[in-house]
Amino acid sequence: MVHENLNGRVAVITGGGGVLCSGFAKDLAAQGVKVAILDLREDAAKKVADEINAAGGTALEVGCNVLESESLEAAREKINAELGSCDILINGAGGNS
């Protein structure tokens, strides 16, 4: 099901390189949402962003430690500059360690 009212919105997904949140990211991108994939493991975030972009979506990977305010501020600045301000937040960081 396509939700046209999501088209062009910006979603920020922490923990976006993981299994569950990467699924959220891909589903939102399929709805036309521009997705910022935040993850402590930037390589994992890049893999998800590359998959979304290759499928015709818009995604940006951002290496970010959600426990550090400086890291969050840098992420916010990058996202705002490249995608726009956040409309949707999915806070999935936390891991299974």
Report the location of each language-model feature.
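Generic hydrophobic, amphipathic alpha-helix propensity
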Residues: 20, 45-48, 52
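Conserved amphipathic alpha-helix within the SDR
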Residues: 49, 53, 59-63, 68-86
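Canonical Rossmann dinucleotide-binding motif of NAD(H)/NADP(H)-dependent dehydrogenases/reductases
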Residues: 4-36
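Amphipathic, non-transmembrane alpha-helical secondary structure
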Residues: 22, 26, 30, 46, ...
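Conserved NAD(P)H cofactor-binding loop of Rossmann-fold oxidoreductase domains
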Residues: 92-97
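Conserved glycine-rich Rossmann-like NAD(P)H-binding loop of the short-chain dehydrogenase/reductase
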Residues: 31-47
